[in-house]
Amino acid sequence: MSTALPLCSILILAGGRGQRMGGRDKGLVSWHGEPLVAHVQHVVREFSDDVVISCNRNQERYALYADQLVSDAEVDFPGPLAGVITGLKVARHEWVVMLACDAPLIDQALIEGLLRLAVEHDSAAMVRQGGYWQPMFSVLPRRVLPMLEHAWAAGERSLQKALLGAVPVQALECAENDQRLSNFNSPELLL
């Protein structure tokens, strides 16, 4: 018998500079007639009444897909760890599903798998694809916030290092060629 999934917040990270997209805001780049962030939001919406998008520009456009918007406290696109810290501060639920805005092929089974793994072990859960951690596909308990803030204050800027150093992390193993984990972070990948 499977247990019910807990209420969770969804944190979609869309605050990057978009360098590999020629400076374009990746989450708003169109794919199959909709912005990439819309594809992610459609998949996750049924899991939560609290979709938070971390974005540092184009807030009015992102507002269409979020219940809350946050921006990094630091200027000049400091990286995903800054967005995670800011997002965890406003998340309304104890569990937070964290995803990249440029991963439109995710599905509900992936989200459910991460959530179940995190809840069963009462710890963070992260995709490990072909032996490599993928921090942009994670579930975090909000209680990791002080540990991530401490890592940031100590100079850590790597999301993966901060997460793996802060708390036990359960691995959701995925195949190296799992298309659900594709990041569309360059124009060529959108074709």
UniProtKB/Swiss-Prot annotation:
It is found in: Cytoplasm. It comes from Pseudomonas entomophila (strain L48). GTP binds at residues 13-15, 26, 72, 102. Transfers a GMP moiety from GTP to Mo-molybdopterin (Mo-MPT) cofactor (Moco or molybdenum cofactor) to form Mo-molybdopterin guanine dinucleotide (Mo-MGD) cofactor. This is Molybdenum cofactor guanylyltransferase. Its EC number is 2.7.7.77. GO terms for biological process: bis(molybdopterin guanine dinucleotide)molybdenum biosynthetic process. It is an enzyme of class 2 (transferase). Mg(2+) binds at residue 102.
